[in-house]
Amino acid sequence: MKKAIIGKKVGMTQIFDENGRVIPVTVVEAGPCVVVQKKTVETDGYDAIQVGFGELREKLVNKPRRGHFAKAGVSLRRTLKEFRMEDVANYNVGDEIKVDTFEIGDKVDVSGVSKGKGFQGTIKRWNASRGPMSHGSKFHRAPGSMGAASDPSRTFKNKRMPGHMGAKNTTVLNLEVVKIMPEKNIILIKGGIPGPNKGTIVIRNSVKA
């Protein structure tokens, strides 16, 4: 059975296992999410559910989206995501998806938008090697060779160059759920996940599990 939920990254901390070893964990406020729309093969050509997360004031929502929520009979939500599901018949519009969907020990994939780093050079962005920093060298952190001059007289596509770093959709695979607190809608995931604190993330079953 596929599992998926939208959440908000709270931050990182550490817990101790039964042997006293330190485990770094990320705290995520996951759900409750509400099913806003159900899509089926008959109506849309594929099976999926559209899920909303996070409360939102009416003045911040445009008229078409307000109508979309009104049709579903649910309160306004800040984030909408669509999840492909094989068991879509088990869901109805208005159903809540809570953090206890997952269990301790589950392997999950976490998706989010990575932290933006702005414009960065090749050393930070691509882990390129730098030149000598002393002894008369004038080559320190420059990009280096970008291609031949007369032939082919251009820089090849996909050449690793300076540019905007971060702020991209990123997924970390095969993380472990170490603790769940359903009364607080909190889930603790072993290791780090993409994005800044308060960033929106999506937790799914691991594709490798």
From Swiss-Prot:
HAMAP family: Ribosomal_uL3_B. Keywords: Ribonucleoprotein, Ribosomal protein, RNA-binding, rRNA-binding. GO terms for molecular function: rRNA binding; structural constituent of ribosome. Gene3D superfamilies: 3.30.160.810, Translation factors. The keyword rRNA-binding applies. The keyword RNA-binding applies. Residues 127-153 are annotated as: Disordered. Pfam families: Ribosomal_L3. Transmembrane segments: none annotated. Part of the 50S ribosomal subunit. Forms a cluster with proteins L14 and L19. The gene is rplC. GO terms for biological process: translation. Belongs to the universal ribosomal protein uL3 family. InterPro entries: Ribosomal_uL3 (IPR000597), Ribosomal_uL3_bac/org-type (IPR019927), Ribosomal_uL3_CS (IPR019926), Transl_B-barrel_sf (IPR009000). GO terms for cellular component: cytosolic large ribosomal subunit. This is Large ribosomal subunit protein uL3. The lineage of its organism: Bacteria, Bacillati, Bacillota, Clostridia, Eubacteriales. One of the primary rRNA binding proteins, it binds directly near the 3'-end of the 23S rRNA, where it nucleates assembly of the 50S subunit.
